[in-house]
Amino acid sequence: MIPPLSSLVRYDNPVLVSTSKDKGKGAKGTPGKKGALPPVEQKPGLTQTEDILNSILPPREWTEDGQLWVQYVSSTPATRLDVINLQEKLDQQLQQRQARETGICPIREELYAQTFDELIRQVTINCAERGLLLLRVRDEMRMTIAAYQTLYESAVAFGIRKALQTEQGKSEMESRITQLEGDVKDLERQVQEWKFKCEAIEKRESERREVEAKKHKDEVAYLENYAKQLKQQLETFLVPAKKGAPGAPAAAT
């Protein structure tokens, strides 16, 4: 027989039920369902306690070689020594399984859940009503943890989506930056080309102005020289005419 995994909850010895998957309880009666809890009726204390225990902590079942084995939770009351041993086993399991002391740790959560189940078992044997109340506390804690776990998973998924979106946006932005940098370089090249063209045009215009100025200066000099020559010719022409003009007074003898 292969024993089930060890647990901090105290169980009785395994019982062979049948060679088929028949979930009868055998000598101890039919195990209670996991859903609804049995009402607290005026029954013999041992039977009522076992029914409640089986409802709170369902029996463990496994099959080996076609044989169905069932292991029920123990209905033996716990002593002070049992509680001390439970604490020692808890500390030992936490150390052996390397449970984290802080933060989210499934191993630590599992071991503390088993410890709480064992405490519920011990309390239920002494007082069924207190056991059922602790069961409600346990279920409420589990629902709260499940809600926080769902919220945490949703937050993680949201964070991953945002990270992927940011990464995608980053890639697009980097591509856009590369494109804009290329455009800037192209514009700088065009500016440089136009700058060279402007310098060439200014140089040509400067040379043209110099040529025009020199040409204009030469023309002015030529015209001044020509006017001077004409003036001299006119003066030369007018002087003899004045000397031989009729009616001019005779020179004194």
Swiss-Prot record:
Give one GO term, molecular function aspect: dynein heavy chain binding
Q: Where in the cell is it found?
A: Cytoplasm, Cytoskeleton, Flagellum axoneme
Q: Which GO terms describe its cellular component?
A: inner dynein arm; motile cilium
Question: Principal place where this protein is found?
Answer: cytoplasm
Start and end residues of each stretch annotated as Disordered? 19-44
The answer, when asked if Iron is one of the entry's keywords, is no
Biological processes annotated in GO: cilium movement involved in cell motility; inner dynein arm assembly
Is Nucleotide-binding there in the keyword field? no
Entry-linked InterPro entries:
Axonemal_dynein_light_chain
Please give the coiled-coil regions recorded for this protein: 160-239
Sorted keywords for this record are: Cell projection, Cilium, Cilium biogenesis/degradation, Coiled coil, Cytoplasm, Cytoskeleton, Dynein, Flagellum, Motor protein
**Which family is it part of?**
Belongs to the inner dynein arm light chain family.
Task performed by this protein: Plays a dynamic role in flagellar motility. May be necessary for stable assembly of a subset of inner dynein arms or for the binding of these arms to the outer doublet microtubules of the axoneme.
UniProt protein name: 28 kDa inner dynein arm light chain, axonemal
Record organism? Chlamydomonas reinhardtii
